[in-house]
Amino acid sequence: MTAEVEPHSLLAAFKERMRIFHNGEDNNLSKMLESSESAILSLVGSKDYADPRVRELILERARYAYNDQVEFFYQNFQGDLMALSLENYKLEEKHD
């Protein structure tokens, strides 16, 4: 039996988007969301996901991971990832 994982804060939104109405996959989904959050925040240079565009990318990457297609996420969302990365880079540059 696997250990219980703290439900990710985007779990309900992800389940609604994916039309998942049971709780049997909650641990696995929370782990996918956690790894997606880590990957996206690292890629775009953000510290949190208050920006709705960042949350959207986290949900989309988790969707690709859920469907075992995560390798296609980066190609399909390259423009969004680059735009946010550059925006965050400029914001950090202004504070120096």
Question: How should each PLM-predicted stretch be described?
Answer:
Residues 1-60, 87-96:
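Conserved short "hinge" loops at termini or chain/domain junctions
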Residues 59, 63-67:
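Mid-chain, structured segments of secreted extracytoplasmic proteins
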Residues 66-87:
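C-terminal structural segments of small proteins and small subunits
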